């Protein structure tokens, strides 16, 4: 998980839903339905850029849900309610980093779950965390977002992801899996920055 950029917002109880734009309003309405509350006023202070690979949808949804739950004196359970918000289906990494942060590997879903058989919103469980490591405090991550056209979204993004999973080469998948298990995770656990950086760069080229 990254400390910056991030989503920062607050919520107050209300009779209806009031949010600064359609994205936050959608998640606020879903959250109010899940929590069975009449509404909330949502005030957004910081937000993530969308469609640049930072998981902005999941962080926005869970942040909005959590703020509204607390505003109504309810205990938020983001992992339980992420599917009802349409999040945590293909990957549980976004939910796990929202919960605790860290360097996360999740257990994933069966390969046909979001390809041939696309479930309805809420009809899945968030994949559990397989491995979580705290990266050394002395490490610094530089995040560079190109000034380019944002990535795909909505159903176009969904079709692209389903196609990528369906058409994936088994040999390449095995190579990536071996890289993660044999190099990336051990170097993270040991705090070996050089080995971690080399493995991460290789992962980026293969993926």
Descriptions of predicted regions:
Residues 1-56, 66-78, 83, 89, ...:
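ATP-binding N-lobe of GHMP and related small-molecule kinases
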Residues 77-207:
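ATP-dependent small-molecule kinase catalytic core of the GHMP/sugar-kinase superfamily
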Residues 55-57, 95-96:
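Catalytic nucleophile loop
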């Amino acid at each position: 998980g990254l400390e910056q950029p991030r989503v920062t917002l607050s919520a107050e109880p209300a009779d209806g839903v009031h949010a600064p734009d359609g994205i936050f309003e959608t998640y606020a309405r879903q959250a109010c339905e899940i929590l069975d509350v009449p509404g909330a006023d949502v005030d957004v202070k910081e937000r993530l850029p969308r469609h640049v690979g930072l998981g902005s949808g999941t962080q926005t949804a869970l942040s909005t849900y959590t703020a509204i739950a607390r505003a109504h004196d309810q205990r938020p359970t983001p992992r339980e309610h992420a599917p009802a918000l349409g999040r945590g289906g293909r990957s549980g990494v976004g939910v796990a980093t929202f919960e605790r942060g860290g360097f996360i590997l999740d257990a994933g879903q069966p390969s046909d779950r979001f390809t041939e058989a696309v479930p309805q919103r809420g009809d899945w469980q968030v994949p559990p965390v397989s491995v979580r490591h705290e990266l050394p405090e002395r490490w610094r991550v530089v995040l560079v977002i190109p000034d380019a056209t944002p990535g795909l979204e909505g159903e176009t993004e969904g079709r692209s992801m389903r196609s990528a999973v369906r058409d994936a080469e088994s040999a390449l998948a095995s190579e990536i899996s071996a890289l993660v298990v044999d190099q990336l995770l051990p170097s993270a656990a040991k705090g070996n920055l050089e080995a971690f950086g080399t493995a991460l760069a290789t992962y980026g080229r293969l993926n």
